[in-house]
Amino acid sequence: KDDIDWVGSSYVLYDTKKALSRFKNDNPPYKIIDSAQEVRRNQFAEDAKDNDLMIFSLYPTKPVGGMDGGIMVSNDKYKIDYYRAITHLGVSSVNNNSWERKLISSGWKMHPNSAQCYVALKNLEKLDEKNQRIDEIKNQYNEAFELTNRSRHLYRIEAQNKKEFMRNMKDFGIETGFHYGPAHLNPFYSIEKSGPLDKTIESSSKTVSIPFNESLSNRDIKFIIDKVNNYK
């Protein structure tokens, strides 16, 4: 699907309604919602149903940065218990005694350590304050560049010559972000021919991110705006 407009917001990664329709199955359909780049208050209640799954990333540059890993949210206790177990070696704790456990499935060692949780919790406590400052910066950028960006994760602009632009910004001490290329051009996806994805390819050739975090001062923002506009 040649759709890039969702970038910076949550999106439906998978809808089981489409899969379950092919089988006789009494299980109610649910969605898996990827929200790696967006975190806000009451988000699950507003965007999902109780049996849906919503995934958040704790990668350092995400809205709630940790050391790595992520969080899965749902009001479906069965799903949460299952994923908690398979990400903890397939083990389900049967009571408060950590040495008395029950192996219910094959699994992986994917549970976070205490340090990861501590960093993520501290950043979650600051989320409202962070979002307020991010919105202020975003509004200044939008006004300066005549854009309507909504994301609180990355601030994306387009440059006709992306690599030259990035070199130019680096000369002024401004770090910029290089976005991933179109996924369908990777060898892995050559097993099947994709439809026309011209919008995706064009956006990939021009899109670059500029500094966008709550620690930026107004002086920093003005400097970045001036250098970007002077380049244009």
Residue map of PLM features:
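Active-site region of PLP-dependent enzymes
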Residues: 39-44, 50-154, 158
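Conserved PLP cofactor-binding pocket of PLP-dependent enzymes
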Residues: 37, 90-99, 164-196, 202-208
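Short catalytic/ligand-binding loop motif for oxyanion handling, primarily in non-cytosolic enzymes
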Residues: 40-41, 62-66, 80, 165-166, ...
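Hydrophobic faces of well-ordered beta-strands that scaffold small-molecule active sites
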Residues: 31-33, 54, 176, 210
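PLP-dependent aminotransferase-like
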Residues: 1-35, 39
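Short amphipathic alpha-helices in soluble, non-transmembrane regions
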Residues: 83, 165-173, 224-229
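PLP-dependent enzyme catalytic core of the Aspartate aminotransferase-like
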Residues: 191-232
